[in-house]
């Protein structure tokens, strides 16, 4: 029922406002103001030192050489070497400071993104491919690194150098300075054209990268299916098409980029040649010295370089803007209600007390605040749950049965507040769960999913999941559900490192570990979503023995595929198209000879499959 996000959602971003994004990016720089200040000072020193070679050159040509003063030549050369060494030291300090600045900002931004991701509602992850989100936290953040390391601070240094050279050029010869400035409008116009063209291309590049990452993540995760159905050639062709689109976007940006610098170089070269031609008559007339011309040519080259560098910095800014749009779009996604940090932790229910769970006329459909795609076939067709009501008291077990899509797992998801109902209420000990902080709600719940997820780490860590449990408490939890026997057979026991998603253990062993994980926190409410569907009969019997002890005093809601596992439930709800069609104990429902009885006898082999038509 999930409506996947369009792969073209990446292109649906609105027009960016550079000033707005730049101001927001600056908030990440503010905590490191001292580093920025130090880097700017170093850059100013470096810029000032660039003025020394032209002036020293003029001194040698106009004074030392005509006078034949070898000592002055040596002194000037020594000063030039000293200026260059100092400039190199300043460049080293600038690189070090901006590198530290960039890495610290990247560290802060990645941490913020990951913390925000963990607080987003489950429907958000239904809509967004994993690969796209990974791109946000990795590639997009990394693209901002150059902005902070060689963009912002270096841009300030370029501005200072440009201002200093502008003033010095006027002081050296104001007529030649005016001639040098005439090419500036052409440089600015070319830079504006480049800026407008390259921004579109960089946004396209970032979108293409996100699509490639999403495609790779999905295909790698489903590689067994790809190989099983011999889809390698088809998937390779699809990947080639995605990669070709990325290549084309890159080539367009390279084409624009390749045009820009030659045009700037032509403009500056023509300007320098014009300066030399214009200076020749004045030198011949004796109103301008050769040393002044040589110094001015050096100053002019240094004047044009910051202009070119500033445009290059703007290129860096364009890449950063394309990435920051996506990063801030993610950060602006509203978090799930009730996920704010709880400063005062409410005492959790004692497991032996259980809790009372009550559904009051609950209606739910995906798409309305549930965050999934809407079904346009009509208002009644989209309801996954229709007026579901029940109550489960401490120590009782409620079993949910029905065909696929009947709404069983949705009830579990609503209880965990992965989604919110559109109508009705869900109460926990008489308290609407929407008024409870999510952390408080989930502290009382032990949840075993049908699709078990184990993290790449040791067995004990997967059972503990960060909870302050001793090794002995972890072992006790495993022993109570029969997982200890399985764990002891692993090469390193509780220290055995599991592969990604628990790939180094079987499906049945993963389910046993998930039972231990759920029980380790001693929950008051157990939610079991077809928890024994992937284990064999022997393991299932062992788990059932453990569960019968663990359920004592606890409230349990179990989604069951094997009806034989819930015959002892306090009450069984039979769901059909989101409605409660039958309810009662196992014996009462069998006696009624309705849907439940037909399902049960079918599983027991008493009916042919045709007998279930219409169920």
Where are these regions (language model features)?
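Helix-loop-helix
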Residues: 66-75, 168-182, 252-325, 330-331
